[in-house]
Amino acid sequence: MRLPIIKHVLGFIEANDEDWVKETIELLENMSEIASLKDEEIEVMGELLSNLYGTLEVNEMIKEGMDKKEAMNTFMKRVTGAIDK
């Protein structure tokens, strides 16, 4: 997960709405089933999906009243903690 990507997609959600991100997730998940994709291509799609799902989680925290910066930091701490386990 990359914080700059999450931050950028949050800006997109603010300017548009999160439905675009949800539809992009659906498209990428569908495309990941293409049998002829190379491993590297699947890895890139997986990384994009991780960042998009992460952005939706951060956006949910913001909608619940958390400050944007605090929401991003909380999310990244949770992700980092999960990786360390």
What positions do the PLM features span?
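C-terminal alpha-helical interaction appendages
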Residues: 1-85
